[in-house]
Every structure is written in structure tokens, then in C-alpha cells.
Amino acid sequence: ILSALLGLLKSL
């Protein structure tokens, strides 16, 4: 879950 959030931030 946390890794998914980090991935989303990197996509920004």
C-alpha cells in the first residue's frame, strides 16, 4: 500500500 502511494507521488 505504502509503495503504491510512493509510486503515485513519483508519477506527479
Swiss-Prot record:
<feature type="modified residue" description="Leucine amide">
    <location>
        <position position="12"/>
    </location>
</feature>
<comment type="function">
    <text>Shows high hemolytic activity (97% sheep erythrocytes lysis at 50 mM).</text>
</comment>
<keyword id="KW-0204">Cytolysis</keyword>
<comment type="similarity">
    <text>Belongs to the MCD family. Mastoparan subfamily.</text>
</comment>
<dbReference type="GO" id="GO:0031640">
    <property type="term" value="P:killing of cells of another organism"/>
</dbReference>
<keyword id="KW-0027">Amidation</keyword>
<protein>
    <recommendedName>
        <fullName>Polistes-protonectin</fullName>
    </recommendedName>
</protein>
